[in-house]
Regions:
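PLP-dependent amino-acid enzyme catalytic core
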Residues: 1-167
Length: 167
């Protein structure tokens, strides 16, 4: 998957990312998660260790912020076509929840090996689950095909400026 990523000539600059981060609407759906001191671990390593409690988010992960920021940034025309992603877990739940908040369709392509609890969580959030392939790469390829066929917006889990700014 990472091998497919290439440096694009018009990639986003650091300044553009800062601007996107400042405009991110992530707290429409996510909470500002607290830092919690890990006392025993801090003593063990001889330094202060703080845990960022992203497990307190509605989907138990920071991935919600990136997915929500991307989906919130879509024009009404693009959003009306619906969104699609490939994921075996946290990004899938983030996309499903963000799409449900925006009241748009979401298709989530997951490997057939995805734990049932993750598949059910996506379905409970309103995502249309498509099980395909034994691994992420197979699900990813299928999601791209469906995106083209249905003219849906593909929400990449990390290679998207709006997702990055949200996370």
């Amino acid at each position: 998957m990472l091998a497919r990523l290439v440096n694009r000539p018009n990639s986003t600059t650091a300044g553009e990312y800062i601007d996107r981060i400042l405009r991110a609407r992530v707290y429409d759906v996510a909470m500002e998660s607290p830092l919690e001191r890990a006392s025993r671990l801090s003593r063990r390593v001889g330094n202060e260790i703080l845990l960022k409690r992203e497990d307190l988010q509605p989907t138990f992960s920071f991935k919600l912020r990136g997915a929500y920021n991307k989906i919130a940034s879509l024009s009404n025309h693009a959003a009306a076509r619906g969104v699609i992603c490939a994921s075996a877990g946290n990004h899938a739940q983030g996309v499903a929840l963000a799409a449900s908040r925006r009241q748009i369709p979401a298709v989530i392509v997951m490997p057939v090996t995805t734990p049932r609890i993750k598949v059910q969580a996506v379905a409970d959030l309103g995502g249309e689950v498509v099980l395909h392939g034994d691994d992420y790469d197979s699900a990813y390829e299928r999601a791209l095909v469906i995106a083209r066929e249905r003219q849906m917006v593909f929400v990449h889990p990390f290679d998207d400026p709006d997702v990055i700014a949200g996370q």
